[in-house]
Amino acid sequence: MKLFEVLSPPKPLRADAASYVPDAFRRATTKHKGNLGYLGRGAFAQVYSHKNRPASAFKVGIGDGDNTYLKYIERASQNERWKSNPYLPRVHSQKNYKDPGGGASYVVEIEKLEPFMDLEQEEVEAIIDRAFHSLPKDKYSDLPRQYDVVEALQRAAAGYSDAIKNIKDKKLLQALAIIGNIGKSLYSVGKKTGPYARENARMHLDIHTSNVMIRRTSVGAQLVITDPLV
């Protein structure tokens, strides 16, 4: 994959775009090695900065249209109303690749965000005040408040009524509804019956402290749910 192909000015998303490039994943991470800065990794992707695009991050991953991350960013960018939701990531471009051997990979250019865990606790409390009616701290826990936030987000996305009712920010409710609906559609939970249908959907939610990040704004730190599904 030629990483420079996504370093041109951002274009509208084309989820069906595919180019047959041998060794796509390997080439993506070596073509611009001198300009890339490693930011982090997950099970199937790595994230890089590029010195010529300081406001962007580039996620290079293995997978095709069935990849849960690609499904998420495509849905999040599907219409103007969702694109304006501050809790969803801002996606600048996406390119999908397949090589002759059948392997698939992708490069997604997204806004560069800050780690949620780097916030001071006062900033986390400000986020809690804006987003939730209440979120008491467990007096027996020494964990940072970020863990309370992600647990509340995970439970709301999973459809627990008490967690949903505790959210006062309508934009956050919208974002979590999008995430929950994608999880259901990906795993066909809506077509299943029986006692484990809802639990199957919940199993595929993956909202944790590494998959929630921060966008700096004029009114403070804004939560962004970056990669909530497995």
For the regions a protein language model found, what residue spans apply to each?
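Protein kinase-like catalytic core scaffold
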Residues: S56, Y87, Y106-V108, M203, ...
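Conserved structural core of kinase catalytic domains
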Residues: S84-I178
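Catalytic activation segment of kinase domains across protein kinase-like and atypical kinase folds
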Residues: R198-V230
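Short, solvent-exposed loop/turn segments that connect beta-strands within catalytic domains
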Residues: R53-P54, K83-S84, D99-A104, R216-Q222
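ATP-binding glycine-rich phosphate-binding loop
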Residues: P10-R53
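ATP-binding glycine-rich loop module of kinase domains
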Residues: N35-G37, R41-Q94
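Protein kinase catalytic-loop region centered on the HRD/HxD motif
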Residues: S185-R202
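Short acidic, low-complexity intrinsically disordered linear motifs used
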Residues: M1-S8
